[in-house]
Amino acid sequence: MVSQPTTSSGPQFECETGNYHTFCPISCVAWLYQKIEDSFFLVIGTKTCGYFLQNAMGVMIFAEPRYAMAELEEGDVNAKLNAYDELQRLCLQVKKDRNPSVIVWIGTCTTEIIKMDLEGIAPKLEDEIGIPIVVARANGLDYAFTQGEDTVLAAMASRCPAPQEVRSEEEKKERTGGLRTLFSHGKKDEKKAGPAPSEYVDHQPLVLFGSLTDPVVNQLTLELKKQGIRVSGWLPAPRYTELPIVEQGVTYVAGVNPFLSRTASALQRRMRCNLITTPFPIGPDGTRGWIEAICQALGVIPKGLDEREQQIWDALRDDVEFLKGRSVFFMGDNLLEVSMARFLIRCGMIVHEVGIPYMDKRYQQAELELLDRTCRELGHPPVRIVEKPDNYNQIQRIYACKPDLVITGMAHANPLEARGITTKWSVEFTFAMIHGFTNAHDMLKMVRKPLDRNNALKSLGWEKLIQEV
């Protein structure tokens, strides 16, 4: 284990030598193919990847989803078959059957090991078939669970058009006006109703990046609208043809998830955008910090955030009272751990350890500062953050500190439950709506569920969920 020097008041960083004990990053296909409606995802891997996708997303197979598996065979691995010809055949078939606006190739562990030159093949094939091909490497050797989305969005960031590349005003409106069209549905025509005062202040264009469900996108966009901030677009957009316009040196960008560090780097370095370093909008405190950081960067004075945050805390009073004084241990899986730990500390919980597969301190700087401030305000000891934790050592620490709840990946949940340790799957927080003011209750409800179950079992005279034989 390697310890890194920190101030006495800040988080204590350590790094162990464990592997990525996380869900496979190619699972990002599950939500991205639904988010980008005119896309097609082609996962290039072995039978193992196919089995994983069938198990993870098998319920969707009868709906003819917009993803497929390009299964590598022995001839591909030993280079007897021409990779270009095989991918050309598959992409032409996809074009004929679905005619998507973009095809996304997802590289896996096998394509990484045999050094398949997907980035070299894609531009030639793109010119030939006339459909953009985006290459994203989401192999489990180099990336943790949610970083699959990060690699896809980082690859798509370079496809965002500059203002001079958008030819017509109609296309410009299509790329910037999708959300406003949705919000104005059912309202009177502004031309007929007469001119209305502008709801927005004058500021530089803002693009938000991160894949969230449409209701959460609408909520966060409306929260910024209350501050007079117009969101120019989201990455990913609902359609590939609606990717946001990015102007070098002018456009500001902000992330909504802590695992999008490569996307942030791509937008900042390749596209020359101005990155706003923010806490992440998880919990009322994080959402307020996210809005305040964006307002400060754009020169907008925030208003009404004290009342808005207090309103949410009042609604969460019962959950906070239940969780206060209880302890939690994060084993590490989805890279949301630091933001979740900060919110749970604010709710009065004790966090023994935050395990995390990968930590980008520059991208999460504002989140770490908010975590430190939260600990100091509530008298919580400095949080121990362990990067790439070793599971054997973690289990010894769990036995030593005896937490009320362990938030862990699915692989470890049942073995820990069999040893009398209460667990919650971290993957549930990835797929649930936990961002923004109004969804804070849903996250606390998920944290409460296994603890409520224990109370119910005790009322029946059971001490553990799994009975020893």
UniProtKB/Swiss-Prot annotation:
Pfam families: Oxidored_nitro (PF00148). Its cofactor is [4Fe-4S] cluster. The keyword Ribosomal protein does not apply. One of its GO terms (molecular function) is oxidoreductase activity, acting on the CH-CH group of donors, iron-sulfur protein as acceptor. It catalyses: chlorophyllide a + oxidized 2[4Fe-4S]-[ferredoxin] + 2 ADP + 2 phosphate = protochlorophyllide a + reduced 2[4Fe-4S]-[ferredoxin] + 2 ATP + 2 H2O. One of its GO terms (biological process) is photosynthesis, dark reaction. Pathway: Porphyrin-containing compound metabolism; chlorophyll biosynthesis (light-independent). [4Fe-4S] cluster binds at residues 24, 49, 109. Its EC number is 1.3.7.7. Keywords: 4Fe-4S, ATP-binding, Chlorophyll biosynthesis, Iron, Iron-sulfur, Metal-binding, Nucleotide-binding, Oxidoreductase, Photosynthesis. Binds 1 [4Fe-4S] cluster per heterodimer. The cluster is bound at the heterodimer interface by residues from both subunits. Protochlorophyllide reductase is composed of three subunits; ChlL, ChlN and ChlB. Forms a heterotetramer of two ChlB and two ChlN subunits. Belongs to the BchN/ChlN family. Component of the dark-operative protochlorophyllide reductase (DPOR) that uses Mg-ATP and reduced ferredoxin to reduce ring D of protochlorophyllide (Pchlide) to form chlorophyllide a (Chlide). This reaction is light-independent. The NB-protein (ChlN-ChlB) is the catalytic component of the complex. This is Light-independent protochlorophyllide reductase subunit N. The lineage of its organism: Bacteria, Bacillati, Cyanobacteriota, Cyanophyceae, Gloeobacterales.
